[in-house]
């Protein structure tokens, strides 16, 4: 292996300094505040404008890198809508290539889901009116362009989408955006020496980087009051799954999954977050001690040195976010609510069963995506049992539906996974009870796909026709 004098000096510097300086950010003084995306709300029938364009962003101090984003910033604003509203959304593509967008987890008819059937060429717009009829949930919007989704999401075409309803407004939980209720968008990237993201499609599987980002920042901190803090977690990485825990071992209180609140809070010490998956957690900060969210073991000194000469998939730092309590009085002082939602009882029985196979190679059930082929035909208002198997562990998403996890490799799902979902980690076999609540049409089908974005780009996508209820 040959390498430059500059690379040798950089590697030598790491080897000399790594033992003396913790490689987390590295010290508190070098941490930057958590960037909180601006909030864009639907009110009084006003349209929401979403401009897809080039921008610049600072991933490392003192540098600015070219990125893509929405409304002039890396990633995009947080969208907040209300159940019962009809929201007009105006996408404007000011990029030099075709883009299609979707809101993952949104329950609307097929023609309004976006995706390949709603491709925007450069300088084109798309303006759907979205009927918001689902319960409160944390969703996300992102590029969904055939053969380009992985690159476009990596570039920055993604953001959080919040649905609120009467229940979410009245629950005694934090709900002041940017004060005690924060979006936490987790990604991994590979940055060059100038702080610019690098992307190269892997020969197999999905992209993994060595630098962890939250809302576009490395190892950020956020100042919070001494009370309950609500974190809305989104894994917007191309393929990496995270196992989250608190640095001092305190509990994470899970209150919501992909499609809304759990019946009751679930306290866990470790929490899985698969690509495309969303979870909401509450953290108790009443003791006034600083604490961090982490995600496993960081790279060793040898791994860090090796990373200067070849791409690494091992995270340099596993620090996700530091919570720093202040002397401010909490906005929410109540105890954790015992119940969030009444327990729902499934009405009706599955009308049929399906087997879905995700292999090491691209494709679903041995077939690559074909825009002219409908793979599944179902009926609105019915249930089906899906058994999903994966040879290579990966995340799996179904558009336009909600599902319950019946079992994971023959065992009951964890309590935090027993709410309504649209995305699931598959390592072996999972059995799902899928409910078709929305219709789609042949030219505007729903999609089910690997949430390893590179696998989806290579053809791990199926198309689903849901006939309207008669």
Tell what function each PLM region has.
Residues 26-274, 281, 287, 320-334, ...:
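Histidine-centered copper-binding motifs that mark active-site loops
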């Amino acid at each position: 292996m040959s390498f430059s004098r500059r690379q040798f000096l950089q590697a030598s510097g790491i080897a000399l300094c790594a033992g003396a300086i913790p490689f987390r950010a590295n010290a508190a003084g070098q941490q930057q505040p958590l960037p909180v995306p601006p909030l864009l709300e639907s009110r009084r029938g006003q349209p929401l404008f979403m401009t897809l364009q080039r921008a610049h962003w600072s991933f490392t101090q003192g540098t600015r890198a070219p990125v893509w984003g929405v409304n002039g910033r890396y990633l995009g604003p947080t969208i907040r809508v209300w159940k019962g509203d009809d929201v007009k959304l105006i996408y404007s593509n000011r990029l030099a290539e075709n883009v299609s967008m979707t809101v993952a987890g949104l329950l609307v008819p097929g023609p309004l889901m976006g995706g390949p059937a709603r491709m925007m060429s450069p300088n084109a717009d798309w303006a759907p009116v979205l009927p918001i009829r689902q319960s409160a949930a944390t969703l996300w919007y992102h590029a969904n362009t055939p053969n380009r989704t992985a690159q476009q999401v990596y570039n920055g075409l993604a953001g959080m989408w919040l649905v609120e309803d009467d229940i979410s407004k009245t629950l005694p939980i934090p709900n002041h955006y940017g004060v005690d209720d924060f979006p936490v968008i987790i990604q991994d990237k590979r940055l060059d020496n100038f702080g610019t993201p690098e992307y190269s499609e892997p020969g197999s599987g999905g992209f993994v980087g060595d630098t962890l980002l939250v809302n576009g920042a490395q190892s950020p901190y956020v100042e919070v009051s001494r009370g309950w803090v609500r974190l809305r977690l989104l894994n917007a990485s191309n393929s990496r799954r995270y196992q989250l825990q608190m640095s001092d071992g305190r509990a994470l209180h899970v209150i919501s999954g992909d499609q809304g609140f759990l019946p009751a809070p679930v306290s866990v010490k470790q929490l899985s977050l698969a690509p495309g998956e969303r979870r909401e957690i509450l953290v108790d900060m009443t003791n006034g001690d600083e604490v961090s969210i982490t995600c496993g073991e960081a790279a060793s000194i040898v791994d860090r040195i090796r990373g200067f000469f070849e791409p690494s998939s091992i995270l340099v730092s596993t620090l996700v976010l530091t919570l720093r309590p202040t002397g401010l009085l909490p906005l929410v002082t109540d105890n954790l609510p015992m119940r969030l939602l009444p327990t729902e009882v499934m009405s009706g029985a599955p009308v049929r069963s399906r087997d879905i196979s995700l292999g090491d190679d691209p494709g679903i059930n041995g077939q690559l995506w074909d825009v002219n082929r409908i793979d599944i035909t179902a009926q609105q208002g019915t249930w089906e049992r899906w058994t999903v198997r994966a040879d290579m562990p990966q995340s799996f998403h179904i558009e336009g539906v909600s599902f319950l996890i019946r079992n994971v490799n023959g065992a009951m799902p964890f309590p935090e996974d027993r709410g309504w979902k649209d995305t699931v980690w598959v390592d072996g076999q999972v059995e799902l009870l899928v409910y078709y609540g929305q219709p789609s049409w042949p030219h505007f089908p729903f999609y089910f796909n690997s949430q390893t974005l590179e696998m989806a780009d290579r053809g791990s996508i199926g198309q689903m026709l849901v006939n309207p209820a008669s």
